[in-house]
């Protein structure tokens, strides 16, 4: 009998070690996995391990609910909410350990940028601010936002925030003296406004779109010129009006700005 065959036969008689099961809790606890499967739960901080970053498919992820980029979708009407429901609660976007002053920005639908600032305290206190909408598409603006990182003030701020949008968005910053004066002036001239009540019901997105339309209105030279906002909705530049108030789906600017009407 060849020596190699004899050795193989003897080896087959030896007891084999028990098969290692990747589903056994003791194995998963001793061998942290990088696969986002059920086995990952054993190394998650919720299981008693030290809180901190843990790997999922080779990407460092903080514990807790993750902040996801909202994919803009064309709404059926501009009165759709400015941000999805999952972005309405600040704790839902908390990322690991943060210090007061940390800011997280999130692109919402139609190119709006929602900024959350952590104010400290047990449980976390957040303030949020909506900026925009921005000119350009989501794909064009996203790289700029990613390169800006977390800052106190976003470098994407292109001009002042929409009038009235801050309070409508719920950041609670209140009115400044200038805004209060504008509001009083609008109320005083309210009865004199003869603008048609055309467009969707008022809402945060509508106000933002109206603000965007006012900027475009300043550029529109020909009466009746139509422009399309970042959300894909058509606005028509019309007559010049002295009133300055936001109405259903349109805004009348100063005498220097054309009237803007939501078309489709």
From Swiss-Prot:
Residue spans of biased composition, Basic residues class: 188-197
Compositionally biased intervals (Low complexity): 29-40
Residue ranges with Polar residues bias: 144-154
Disordered, as annotated region: 1-52, 123-207
Name by which UniProt lists this protein: Putative uncharacterized protein encoded by LINC00482
Taxonomic path: Eukaryota, Metazoa, Chordata, Craniata, Vertebrata
């Amino acid at each position: 009998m060849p020596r190699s065959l004899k050795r193989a036969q003897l080896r087959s008689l030896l007891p084999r070690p028990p098969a290692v099961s990747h589903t056994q809790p003791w194995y998963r606890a001793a061998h942290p996995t990088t696969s986002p499967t059920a086995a990952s739960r054993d190394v998650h901080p919720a299981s008693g391990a030290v809180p901190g970053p843990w790997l999922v498919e080779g990407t460092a992820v903080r514990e807790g609910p993750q902040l996801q980029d909202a994919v803009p979708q064309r709404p059926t009407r501009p009165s759709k909410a400015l941000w999805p429901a999952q972005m309405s609660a600040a704790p839902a976007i908390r990322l690991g350990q943060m210090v007061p002053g940390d800011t997280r920005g999130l692109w919402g639908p139609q190119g709006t940028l929602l900024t959350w600032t952590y104010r400290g305290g047990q449980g976390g206190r957040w303030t949020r601010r909506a900026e925009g909408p921005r000119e350009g598409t989501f794909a064009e603006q996203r790289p700029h936002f990613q390169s800006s990182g977390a800052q106190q003030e976003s470098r994407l701020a292109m001009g002042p925030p929409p009038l009235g949008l801050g309070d409508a968005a719920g950041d609670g910053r209140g009115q400044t003296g200038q805004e209060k004066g504008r509001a009083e002036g609008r109320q005083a001239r309210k009865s004199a406004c003869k603008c048609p009540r055309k467009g969707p019901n008022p809402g945060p997105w509508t106000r933002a779109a109206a603000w965007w339309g006012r900027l475009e209105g300043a550029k529109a030279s020909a009466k009746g010129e139509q422009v399309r906002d970042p959300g894909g909705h058509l606005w028509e530049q019309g007559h010049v009006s002295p009133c300055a108030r936001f109405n259903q789906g349109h805004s009348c600017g100063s005498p220097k700005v054309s009237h803007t009407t939501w078309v489709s």
